[in-house]
């Protein structure tokens, strides 16, 4: 760039004019901002939010205490204590999930052979204390009961990719 070009750019402020033109161009385009608490954007069927434990249609919990989710969790956020039953099967006596450790990777959901643990569509679960983010089995089952219709739809929509 020659001396004359640099001088012309400095005095004519061409970069400034280009920036102002860009600003004016976007000023009159429609806004893309979502007013969050009042408007919510669409979520993918693969969105990974708050965890839930699902039940079978007859009301029995799905978790067979195989501990695959506990083994695969990279953050070690899941703790399961199995309890044997009279018929030889087993269920989880204790199923604890530390949401402060969870990294929402979805590996627990992928590892579960019976689709017991799933990550649902809820992303609004702020709490006032840290202790409220330690989910036990009853809290996870309550989440599953509350979101069952949505969870079943998401699992069915994602089935071709599993």
Curated annotation (Swiss-Prot):
Top-level taxon of origin: Bacteria
* Binding annotation for [4Fe-4S] cluster 1: 63, 66, 69, 112
Residues annotated as transmembrane: none
Which principal EC class is assigned to this enzyme?
translocase
Give binding positions for [4Fe-4S] cluster 2: 73, 102, 105, 108
Which keywords annotate this record? 4Fe-4S, Cell inner membrane, Cell membrane, Iron, Iron-sulfur, Membrane, Metal-binding, NAD, Quinone, Repeat, Translocase, Ubiquinone
Keyword DNA repair in record: no
Q: Name one GO cellular component term.
A: plasma membrane
**Which cofactors are required for activity?**
[4Fe-4S] cluster
Name the principal localization, coarsely classed: membrane
- Keyword check for Ion transport: no
Reactions accelerated catalytically: a quinone + NADH + 5 H(+)(in) = a quinol + NAD(+) + 4 H(+)(out)
According to its UniProt entry, the protein's GO biological process terms are:
aerobic respiration
Pfam short name (any one)? Fer4_7
Which residues belong to any copy of the 4Fe-4S ferredoxin-type domain? Answer: 53-83, 93-122
MF GO annotations: 4 iron, 4 sulfur cluster binding; iron ion binding; NADH:ubiquinone reductase (non-electrogenic) activity; quinone binding
What's the EC number here?
Answer: 7.1.1.-
Classify the protein's membrane topology as the record does: Peripheral membrane protein
Report the locations given in the UniProt record.
Answer: Cell inner membrane
Functional description taken from the UniProt entry: NDH-1 shuttles electrons from NADH, via FMN and iron-sulfur (Fe-S) centers, to quinones in the respiratory chain. The immediate electron acceptor for the enzyme in this species is believed to be ubiquinone. Couples the redox reaction to proton translocation (for every two electrons transferred, four hydrogen ions are translocated across the cytoplasmic membrane), and thus conserves the redox energy in a proton gradient.
Of which family is this protein a member? Belongs to the complex I 23 kDa subunit family.
> Subunit structure, briefly?
NDH-1 is composed of 14 different subunits. Subunits NuoA, H, J, K, L, M, N constitute the membrane sector of the complex.
Query: What is the official name of this protein in its record?
Result: NADH-quinone oxidoreductase subunit I
Per the record, the gene is nuoI
